[in-house]
């Protein structure tokens, strides 16, 4: 498992700009070739460069897993077209629910999903239908309702909010069928997704992430 530090647009909050699975990585248009090369070198996926809803905050607006990429209802037709044309090995679905920050409210891998508890049953069903996952439940992590903001889960492993209890870790591990650990990023931030991007090939962390945090992240995502 390869790990490296990264900054984007002068910030360590790299996860707000990046969505990745094991096949594709979606990022906004970035002029810095070294940044793009590092992302591709660590995550080892095809790179898709686009805005989402005219925003560079791809990681906040997009979610999914190795089978499907979920886009918010505000995604523009040309953005959807770009992703569908390039991400040919996964489904691309637009989810018509009230919230648009899908990356913050839906935490998913190919085995399960944890979803923002304030969604209506109709909205939950739309998310389940888009994901095509039977095991999708509403919940929180460490009493945080924006579950996608405080965890990163792959099909191999995951890291969640440092204050998640042992019972929470056990239940989440059973839901996602992977080993989990808790930790922080970017010198103490509990908002894991903002500072960590991971797939089965590698991990990127914000440049402020400390050595102790990196050791914990490496332990979480090690083979």
Swiss-Prot record:
**Which function does this protein serve?**
Binds to the 50S ribosomal subunit and prevents its association with the 30S ribosomal subunit to form the 70S initiation complex.
**GO terms, biological process:** cytosolic ribosome assembly
| Alphabetized UniProt keyword annotations | Initiation factor, Protein biosynthesis
Protein known as? Translation initiation factor 6
Record's superkingdom? Archaea
Q: What is the organism field in this record?
A: Sulfolobus acidocaldarius (strain ATCC 33909 / DSM 639 / JCM 8929 / NBRC 15157 / NCIMB 11770)
One Gene Ontology MF term: ribosome binding
Say which family it is in: Belongs to the eIF-6 family.
Does the keyword section mention Protein biosynthesis? yes
- InterPro entries under this entry? eIF6
**Pfam families assigned:** eIF-6
Q: Is Protein biosynthesis among the key words of this record?
A: yes
């Amino acid at each position: 498992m390869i790990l490296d530090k990264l900054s984007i647009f002068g910030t360590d909050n790299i996860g707000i700009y990046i969505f990745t699975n094991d096949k594709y990585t979606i990022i906004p248009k970035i002029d810095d070739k070294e940044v793009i090369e590092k992302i591709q070198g660590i995550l080892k996926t095809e790179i898709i460069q686009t805005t989402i809803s005219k925003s560079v905050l791809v990681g906040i607006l997009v979610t999914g897993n190795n089978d499907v990429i979920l886009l918010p209802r505000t995604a523009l037709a040309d953005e959807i077209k770009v992703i569908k044309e390039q991400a040919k090995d996964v489904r691309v679905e637009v989810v018509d629910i009230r919230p648009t920050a899908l990356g913050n409210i839906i935490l998913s891998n190919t085995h399960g999903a944890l979803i923002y508890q304030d969604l209506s049953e109709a909205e939950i069903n739309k998310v389940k239908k888009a994901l095509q996952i039977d095991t999708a439940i509403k919940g929180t992590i460490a009493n945080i309702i924006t579950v996608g903001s405080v965890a990163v889960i792959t099909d191999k492993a995951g890291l969640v909010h440092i204050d998640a209890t042992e019972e929470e870790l056990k239940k989440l591990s059973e839901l996602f069928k992977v080993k989990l650990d808790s930790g922080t990023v970017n010198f103490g931030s509990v908002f894991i997704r903002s500072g960590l991007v991971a797939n089965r090939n590698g991990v990127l962390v914000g440049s402020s992430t400390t050595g102790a945090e990196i050791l914990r992240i490496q332990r979480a995502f090690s083979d």
